């Protein structure tokens, strides 16, 4: 870590320093919010969780060698230095902004309803052909995760690819004001988090706030196949550039051919008319859109067509996200990290590419509000339309999903109250050679199911 002195940190978060002022000129060697990760020379920011008051762990961090602590509680006279602030959550963002601005680098900001993480991985894979790239860790994309990602940036970072996720109005500006993106990418406007945003237009309004913090001379890259994004007008005098499959897209994919679970082949045409054939090495036609987004960002940052192609074709597979696992008894399509109605249907499409019996193990989709029952039912109908052989619904919200799936002529549908009930039934319902999709919202803990299937 570099260029973060206690004095500059105090100034950045508008805090009041208490303690030995001789350390004000010293630089911290790390910033953490998890007291268990404190090492000598670190700054600990005490952020209270829903169930835990982080301030009670301050003595432990001091014993572990913390140089200083950021607190929103007045700790009075202490034998260790601390910075008193109004809000430690805001202080974390302010310190992250200070650190981000200490780098001479480009920042790619990514948001959208579906595909943020997979698009982030694709863009990072492309840019890594030319630059030292730092990317969001996993899906650390919220008001705590974004700062953690920024603090972990190596000093030689040339491009940061930062994912930003929101589920309430007002959150995006708090994130984008920290990241200050040079390139803004929006993957799509779906129906995730309707419980809070109410309409797709509300989602668009919040997601597009990222562009307000774009740096001068920046670029806006949007999914031209999205019916709302394709209508966006110039923002801050910058006209959007579109990626997708339509004639309105400056970066376009055609000749799209599924290659089973190997991925999808396509031809990608760049803004200057250059085109190349490539294999997107992750199953699902929807992944082609991510590849074209990667091509658009790569082109904008000066990569050649051959570098872009190499980045797309070397995309690593990530557990929980369209991850193929082959065991002695079955093929598992591990897409269990998260779920919404659009991504559920896309994963069913991927399952349909497999050869042999197809099983969809589907769990609750969260944050759908009053539309939850209808949207779960739609997924069940879709599974039946795609002739999935067996649909297993897990969780209270999947009653409607199972009911609609069971109406399919070729589809058997079973409901389970929880993960344990399903796991106990596995020997009775699955067969050797099955292709098994595992997908649900994050809170359903479906990695537990993936692990159980792997252990068979």
What function would you assign to each model-found segment?
Residues 2-109, 118-129, 151, 403, ...:
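Short, basic phosphate-binding NTP loop
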Residues 72-73, 105-108, 134, 185-191, ...:
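Short beta-strands and strand-loop turn motifs
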């Amino acid at each position: 870590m570099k260029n973060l002195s206690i004095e500059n940190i105090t100034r950045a978060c508008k805090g009041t320093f208490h303690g030995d002022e001789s350390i004000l000129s010293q630089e911290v060697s790390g910033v953490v919010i998890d007291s268990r990760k404190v090492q000598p020379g670190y700054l600990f920011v005490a952020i209270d969780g829903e169930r835990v008051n982080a301030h009670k762990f301050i003595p432990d961090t001091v014993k572990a060698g913390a140089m200083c602590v950021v607190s929103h509680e007045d700790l009075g006279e202490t034998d260790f230095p601390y910075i008193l602030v109004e809000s430690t959550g805001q202080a974390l963002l302010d310190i992250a902004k200070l650190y981000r601005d200490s780098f001479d680098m480009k920042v790619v900001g990514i948001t959208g309803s579906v595909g943020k993480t997979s698009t982030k991985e694709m863009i990072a894979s492309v840019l890594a052909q030319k630059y030292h790239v730092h990317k969001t860790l996993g899906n650390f994309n919220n008001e705590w995760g974004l700062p953690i990602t920024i603090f972990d940036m190596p000093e030689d970072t040339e491009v940061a690819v930062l994912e930003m996720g929101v589920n309430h109005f007002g959150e995006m500006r708090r994130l984008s004001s920290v990241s200050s993106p040079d390139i803004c990418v929006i993957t799509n406007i779906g129906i995730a988090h309707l419980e809070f945003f109410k309409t797709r237009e509300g989602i668009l309004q919040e997601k597009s706030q990222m562009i307000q913090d774009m740096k001068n001379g920046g670029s806006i890259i949007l999914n031209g196949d999205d019916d709302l994004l394709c209508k966006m007008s110039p923002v801050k005098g910058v006209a959007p550039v579109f990626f997708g499959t339509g004639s309105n897209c400056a970066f376009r994919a055609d000749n799209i051919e599924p290659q089973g679970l190997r991925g999808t082949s396509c031809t990608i045409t760049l803004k200057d008319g250059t085109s190349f054939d490539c294999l997107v090495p992750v199953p699902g036609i929807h992944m082609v859109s991510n590849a074209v987004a990667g091509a658009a960002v790569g082109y904008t940052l000066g990569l050649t067509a051959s570098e872009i192609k190499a980045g797309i074709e070397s995309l690593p597979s990530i557990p929980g996200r369209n991850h193929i696992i082959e065991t002695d008894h079955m093929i598992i399509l591990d897409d269990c990290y998260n779920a919404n109605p659009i991504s559920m249907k896309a994963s069913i499409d991927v399952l349909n590419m497999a050869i042999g019996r197809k099983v969809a193990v589907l769990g609750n989709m969260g944050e759908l509000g009053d539309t939850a029952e209808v949207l779960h039912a739609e997924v069940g109908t879709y599974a039946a339309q795609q002739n999935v052989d067996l649909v297993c619904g897990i969780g209270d919200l999947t009653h409607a999903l199972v009911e609609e799936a069971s109406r399919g002529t070729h589809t058997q549908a079973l409901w389970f109250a929880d993960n344990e009930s399903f796991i106990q039934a596995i020997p009775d319902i699955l067969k050797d050679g099955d292709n098994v999709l595992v997908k649900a919202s994050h809170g359903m803990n479906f990695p537990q199911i993936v692990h159980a299937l792997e252990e068979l």
